[in-house]
Amino acid sequence: LVINPTRGNNILDKIFTNCSQYYSVPVILPPIGKSAHNVVFLSAKVTLFKPVGYKTVHRRNMNFDSISSIACELINYPWQKLYHLNDCQKQADLFYEVLSNIVDRHAPLRQVRFKNNDKPWITECFKQLIERRDEAYQSGSVIVYKRLRNQVNRVRNSLKTNYYFNQVHCLKSENSRNWWRHIKTLAGALDSCSTSDCFVNLTCNGQHINSDELPEVLNNFFVSVTADVSPLDLAELDNLRARLCDVPDCFIVSEYSVFNALRHLNVNKSSCDDVLSNKLLVTLADVLAAPICALINTSIRQGIVPNQWKTARVTPIPKINPPLLIESDLRPISVTSGISKVAESFVCQLFNRHFDNFVDSNQFGCTSKRSTVHALIKISTLLFKSSDSSSNIIRILFIDFSKAFDLVDHNVLLRKFVAYDFPPHIIAWSMSFLQERVQFVSVRNNNSSCQTLKAGTPQGTRSGPNDFKLLINDLSFSIDYAKYVDDTTVVSIASDPCDRSLQVAADRLSMWCADNHMKINTKKTKEMLIYFGRKFDKEAVASLILDNDQIERVETFKLLGVIFSSDLSWGPHVSYLLGKVSKRYYLIFQLARLGVAQHDITLIYCAIIRSILEYACAVWHSGLTTTQSNDIERVQKRCLRIIYPDLSYRDALFISGLDRLCVRRENIVRDMFKDIQQPDHVLHNILPAKRNPKFNSRHSYSYSLPVARTQRYSNSFLAYCIRKRY
């Protein structure tokens, strides 16, 4: 950065940086004292933003009068015009034209400015007290400053307490959503990811992005991901539509079903359509059910999705906070219209009704009566059982797809639909929903231009996970594996260090990706090696090669929210849990300081802390050591000490109505094992043979007790439950 001489005519002082755009040109100043070197003054580029006292948004005034006027016009409109049209797109154009005209007439889109007001509990006297404190700080009067600082803290807590009991406490029974929002505001726990500063450090190709250009840059990148994918062959889709016959009766949607679907839309969620908001659809469900029902039935009958349902507003959701790279730190979530969600819900029901007969038994994602916990139990049971033999070498491959949903090839997906013999109406509708989708990115109320996508299935829609589940359904291996939508885990068990079964599985994965036009993220794909023999050289096990890249071998890996380690202990996972909940003590402490009702704080503790400590506990509870179990119990003990400072732990449990965490985990394990014993459960096949003793006694086992050589296997979920006679 230094370009001027710093000693005589020579440049002897250097400053190196890879972020030169953030610094001004160094200023060369005279030397200090007797030094022969000039002083190099380097300053960062500081852009002073003029604080904006308001923000501008565009919204419609959907009050009672405007909604009533809209309803009256819709009731009197002759919808027979729409019913007599035989083209789905023409029906949609007429429907949206009528709705737009009526809504614009009674609730026009207006520009509204919102002032950045103070917090609702702040008063003028409190603001004056803050000014006096700041003046004392600037004057250097330490004693006066500390006195005013303490006074500010006391007054602030008092104002918050009064505000809670006068304005917030009553919302608990009236509007729990607003109650929870005010609770987070009072405790200072609002999500920082929702602020306007979330994307200030984003870079694309190493270049910082101007905030005004951010939506357009994001949209260009999201669309560029699909640049190398071939678009859908329209000839095949037209041939499929030409073979459409009469739609089956079970595909016909009733007006009452549409009415119920509209009534169950979430009014608190946004919609891509600024005319038909979810609030308007819910309020006018009885009026709009008939025309929307006709539109959905025509769409299914013709296998065509109207263009209005294929437009999405993309909201970039950070994977990390704050996000730094556009290429890897953002996830595009598509927000579609409310009517599109209703239509998707009916088609997804038809999809699942057919596909449930073909879905892979090792697929646990987005499938009825299956969850992440079931996938984790299947994998952990296999690992603990295999590790009981000291000669077994266990290798686990954790697969990560690169841009999994964005790279779905529509031509490949169409072939999968046909291969699984889906009804042609479902195929045509699903492919039409993906064909020539249009999206725009919205950031801070700034929208990019609309662009058309050639591939991918939108995240955030109801049909997106189903499409990917169909795509990956034929990905199978000759060894054990489990899938949760795009998270795939492969397990190899062998006694020979030279065994190549996992490498064969990796080669099979590469071939599948080549055939289905998918990509593996080899940087995030990991391998774990588990072995408990006395003499073992890890170097004897050849490294795994995937797409000509060597896969990194790790000691720990977080799979579906649970950390597995190479020694099959739960220490790393317990440390992860304790670290995660430690960040949330502050919320409990702040609410207790404000004098919030103890029962309310207990509810908040159960929601934000206890739920974390109990996630997938059926997998790891039985393998905890006494120390680990006590460490987890200490979290609840600490929270109850904050909420009930004058009570012992036992008395606090009694007053709050809570159980010990170890007792709750034990009950969860017992209930999970009872569910698995149902014959139609997805994990019923992991149970050992059922015993038929000649004499039934209190101490007999329902299942054959696994013979465990190690305490590790004896404390696994399955062996533990059988030994406990659950």
Q: Can you annotate each of these PLM segments?
A:
Residues I399-Y484, I493:
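Conserved polymerase palm-domain catalytic core
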Residues L1-S20, E73-N86, N178, F422, ...:
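Metal-dependent phosphoesterases centered on the DNase I-like endonuclease/exonuclease/phosphatase
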Residues S43, F49, L82, N86-D93, ...:
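Surface-exposed loop/turn segments and immediately adjacent short secondary-structure elements
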Residues C19-K115, C193-C198, C204-E216, N220, ...:
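Surface polyanion/phosphate-binding segment centered on an Asp-His-Pro turn
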Residues V347-F364, S387-D388, I394, P465-S492:
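Active-site palm subdomain of RNA-directed nucleic acid polymerases
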Residues V267-L276, V314, L325-V335, V373-V418:
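Conserved catalytic palm subdomain of right-hand nucleotidyl-transferase polymerases, strongest
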